[in-house]
């Protein structure tokens, strides 16, 4: 397996503290405006859901607890949204939620617009949890259903492309099957690990030419970023999968986040890489990435099966 690039500079033992600062985010969410047009249970579901969005913003690399106020799909969407914001460390967040124009589709289903007005402390120095203050607003079209456990947010139509590049569904729409998705994630994780100088966890999930390409990309990343502390990635914006016999073709956008030394501090740069992947099913039923086409950091890949 590739061991990662040689660096002009390598983080020393003293630099181990210079990582993303671990912290417990301070989040305050309040309802305002026409909140009284909703029941207390509906209000609580919206507040809990908004708190989850803020938690994912502050800690996008950590799993969210499974709570009854929303669905697994929206939890994954929240983490994708948070990852897109994660070029910064987000500390205290103060949110006012303005519900508007609730429409009851039935006794057990309601749609409501929710305007979020957020004031957050953030830092571009990843070792700090306080810095500047940033205020922004976003509009969410929420769908709530009544379940046996109470009211649950089951839909969130939101566009924040001008803020962080997020569009509703970008993390969960048109997903391939779980086994194919796992092979894709393992392949992307391998590339990120090599770029960060880590040992890949599952190097056999892609072919030797793609492992060699990961090494070449890592060398290019050193030229771009010099000292790399960490690299994380997320797949998003999947196109519908194309299948032909024992191979499938998947088009997606990889969201790549590189923590690196910039002007004397640890900072993050986020970039997007559009991939066209080819996967082949193995004799044991698992899937292996055997082809990729992309351009990133001035590097071009055109590995065919």
Pin down the residues of each PLM region.
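Intrinsically disordered, low-complexity, compositionally biased regions/tails
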Residues: 8-11, 37, 86, 95, ...
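Intrinsic disorder/low-complexity detector
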Residues: 17, 63-64, 110, 123, ...
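Short amphipathic beta-strand and strand-loop transition segments with alternating hydrophobic
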Residues: 93-105, 230-243
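Exposed beta-sheet edge and beta->alpha loop/turn motif
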Residues: 107-175, 245-305
């Amino acid at each position: 397996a590739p061991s990662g690039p040689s660096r002009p500079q390598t983080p020393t033992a003293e630099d181990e503290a210079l990582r993303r600062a671990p912290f417990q985010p301070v989040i305050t969410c309040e309802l305002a405006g026409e909140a009284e047009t909703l029941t207390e249970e509906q209000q609580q579901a919206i507040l809990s859901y908004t708190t989850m969005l803020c938690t994912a913003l502050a800690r996008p690399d950590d799993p969210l607890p499974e709570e009854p106020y929303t669905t697994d799909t929206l939890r994954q969407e929240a983490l994708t949204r948070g990852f897109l914001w994660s070029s910064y460390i987000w500390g205290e967040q103060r949110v006012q939620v303005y519900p508007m124009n609730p429409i009851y589709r039935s006794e057990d289903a309601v749609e409501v617009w929710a305007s979020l007005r957020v004031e957050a402390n953030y830092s571009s120095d990843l070792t700090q949890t306080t810095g500047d203050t940033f205020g922004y607003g976003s509009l969410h079209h929420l769908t709530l259903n009544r379940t046996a456990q109470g009211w649950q947010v089951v839909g969130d139509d939101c566009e924040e492309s001008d803020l962080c590049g997020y569009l509703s569904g970008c993390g969960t729409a048109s997903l391939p099957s779980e086994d194919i998705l796992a092979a894709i994630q393992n392949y992307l994780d391998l590339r990120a690990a090599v770029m960060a100088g880590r040992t890949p966890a599952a190097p056999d999930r892609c072919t030797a030419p793609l492992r060699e390409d990961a090494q070449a990309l890592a060398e290019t990343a050193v030229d771009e970023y010099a000292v790399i502390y960490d690299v994380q990635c997320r797949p998003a914006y999947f196109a519908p999968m194309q299948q032909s016999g024992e191979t499938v073709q998947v088009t997606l956008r990889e969201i790549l986040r590189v923590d690196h030394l910039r002007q004397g501090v640890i900072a993050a740069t986020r970039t997007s890489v559009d991939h066209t992947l080819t996967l082949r099913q193995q004799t044991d039923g698992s899937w292996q990435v055997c082809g990729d086409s992309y351009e990133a950091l001035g590097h071009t890949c055109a590995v065919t099966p």
